[in-house]
C-alpha cells in the first residue's frame, strides 16, 4: 500500500509560508497526497481539519540551539530552545521529534546521537 504525505509544510503563519490550511489541503490533494504535516516556525498548529480522505497532522518547527526540530502530532506551544529539552518537550506532548534539515551545512544534526 502506497501512502503519500509531505511531513514538512509551512502555512501563512510562518515567514516562509504563504497558504492557508484550505489552500494547503487543496494543493496537496491536487498532487496526489493523502496528508500533510503543518509545522510552522515556533508556532503549534491549533486549527483542526476534519476530512475522511485526508490527514492533517498538527506540528511545530522549533528553532533550537542545534538546528530546526519538527514536533509532529504536537498541538501545544513549546518554548524550549536547547535541543535535548525541545525533544523531551515534544515527547511529553505525545509527539514525534524529527530533525527538520539533517543535511544542512549549518546544522549540527549529522553529529547528534539518536534519541
What are these model-predicted stretches?
Residues 1-96, 100, 107-113:
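A metal-dependent hydrolase metal-coordination microenvironment
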